[in-house]
């Protein structure tokens, strides 16, 4: 797909089909996302794929609002920034996440950026508790 077409087609989707994402497709999307540029070529971003429905359901409940729709996604990619690699780890993670969204679109997958850095945890957590830096990108 042409890049301009990817830009036109890219949108946030919050309802997903229940069919699993093929491993080969996931591997391609991840490989393409990890080719994204990073500060000083530090590659300080790590991607973790979750396909276990119980784990995805727990991830969906990590926040009081704004992430419940994750529960029905067949796959979730956690975008994690390594704060020891560079002071620009957040920026690197955002660049990689954006590349991941575009790669998913190119592969015919739906996705949605769910940002949780510094967002409140569940109500039963201690006051001031926050979710550590992580982006959740459900894919289908």
Label every model-predicted segment.
Residues 1-140:
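Acidic, surface-exposed loops and disordered segments
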């Amino acid at each position: 797909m042409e890049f301009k077409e990817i830009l036109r087609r890219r949108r946030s989707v919050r309802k997903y089909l229940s069919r699993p994402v093929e491993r080969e497709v996931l591997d391609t999307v991840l490989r393409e996302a990890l080719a994204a540029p990073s500060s000083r070529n530090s590659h300080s971003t790590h991607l973790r794929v979750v396909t276990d429905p119980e784990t995805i359901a727990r991830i969906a409940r990590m926040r009081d609002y704004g992430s419940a729709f994750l529960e029905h996604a067949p796959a979730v990619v956690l975008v994690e920034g390594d704060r020891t690699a560079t002071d620009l780890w957040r920026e690197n993670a955002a660049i990689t996440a954006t590349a991941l969204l575009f790669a998913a679109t190119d592969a015919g997958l739906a996705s949605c950026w769910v940002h949780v850095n510094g967002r409140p945890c569940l109500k039963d957590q201690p006051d001031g508790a926050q979710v550590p830096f992580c982006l959740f990108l459900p894919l289908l």
